[in-house]
């Protein structure tokens, strides 16, 4: 998908930031140019990201002698430093126009990609109103569509509000059962009804209404979980390496909560030559099984089908 991180972060900086962009980015430029010491975690993350090894440019950066860069070695990123310098000096145009954009377009053309110069030039971020519910006297707000995580979370809270959780031990099997059933219903709301609101009329108010939650809560049984026939066989699932989150509070009390992702760890694994930029793999978040009547997952959601200019549904909140 068209990279949106640079535009979004710079838009936030323009609206809310105090420091000059050059000052904000200089430490990052220095770090990319001078290098970082490869940690145990970074070494293992590279080794577990099969997609990195498939891309010639990524192999040059992240591998030595066909093995992940060694723990304790110095990893320098001169191309990435140049890209950050362009952004530092030219802002959004330093990424979405000029030599960086040309290299992205050239790489897309050489490898059968879909992003062209028009996609980059026309990209813009959007500020959207949060969505929220009242949960036991507390106002809870989160991100709305095209992010789907907020719908999941708020639906689950609404469902749980119909149960007196204080009656049960917090670590009891019944508590976990109710949490699981509430989240399942939240995922059901997300998977079938969420997409880019500029292209699809997402029934957000209805999805997170108390009336909808009451209906969803009615068929939760205290005695049993879902039928065994509807439960997939066990697959060992490790903690996801997909996404990064950070929260920052400054001396004036201003708070930033940022969840950021390339999709998978290291995204698509494809590095644009000469820029150090890793491309995301967010196209997988579209409904790539749209029209498949046997699918009940978000992969077939009518609200999230492929359309030009559309933003894919995000699972984050």
Name each region found by the language model.
Residues 12-18, 30, 34, 106, ...:
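Short, well-ordered loop/turn and helix-capping segments at boundaries between secondary-structure elements
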Residues 53, 123-124, 236-241, 312:
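Short loop/turn motifs at secondary-structure junctions and domain boundaries
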Residues 114-116, 254-317:
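Active-site rim segments in enzyme catalytic domains, especially the processed small/beta chain
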Residues 127, 240-243, 265, 316:
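Short, small/polar residue-rich loop motifs at catalytic or cofactor-binding pockets
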Residues 163-262, 275:
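Internal maturation/activation junctions in enzymes
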């Amino acid at each position: 998908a068209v990279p949106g991180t640079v535009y979004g972060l710079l838009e936030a900086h323009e609206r809310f930031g105090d420091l000059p962009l050059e000052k904000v980015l200089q430490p990052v430029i220095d770090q990319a140019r001078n290098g970082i010491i490869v940690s145990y975690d970074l070494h293992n993350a590279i080794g577990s990201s099969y997609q990195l090894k498939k891309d010639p440019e990524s192999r040059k950066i992240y591998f030595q002698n066909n093995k992940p860069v060694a723990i304790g070695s110095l990893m320098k990123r001169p191309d990435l430093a140049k890209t950050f310098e362009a952004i530092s000096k030219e802002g959004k145009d330093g990424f979405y126009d000029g030599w960086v954009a040309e290299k992205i377009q050239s790489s897309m053309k050489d490898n059968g990609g879909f992003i062209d110069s028009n996609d980059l030039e026309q990209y813009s971020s959007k500020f959207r109103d949060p969505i929220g519910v009242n949960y036991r006297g507390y106002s809870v707000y989160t991100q709305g569509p095209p992010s789907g995580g907020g719908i999941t979370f708020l639906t689950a809270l609404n469902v749980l509000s119909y149960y007196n959780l204080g009656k049960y031990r917090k670590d009891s099997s019944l508590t976990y059962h109710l949490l699981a059933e509430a989240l399942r219903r939240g995922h059901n709301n997300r998977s079938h009804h969420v997409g880019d609101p500029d292209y699809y009329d997402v029934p957000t108010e209805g999805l997170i209404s108390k009336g909808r939650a009451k209906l969803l809560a009615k068929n939760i049984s205290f005695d049993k979980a879902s039928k065994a026939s509807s439960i997939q066989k066990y697959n060992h699932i490790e903690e996801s390496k997909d996404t990064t989150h950070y929260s920052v509070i400054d001396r004036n009390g201003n708070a930033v909560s940022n969840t950021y992702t390339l999709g998978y760890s290291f995204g698509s694994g494809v590095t644009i030559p000469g820029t150090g930029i890793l491309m995301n793999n967010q196209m997988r978040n579209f409904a790539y099984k749209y029209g498949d009547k046997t699918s009940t997952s978000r992969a077939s959601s009518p609200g999230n089908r492929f359309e030009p200019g559309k933003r894919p549904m995000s699972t984050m909140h």
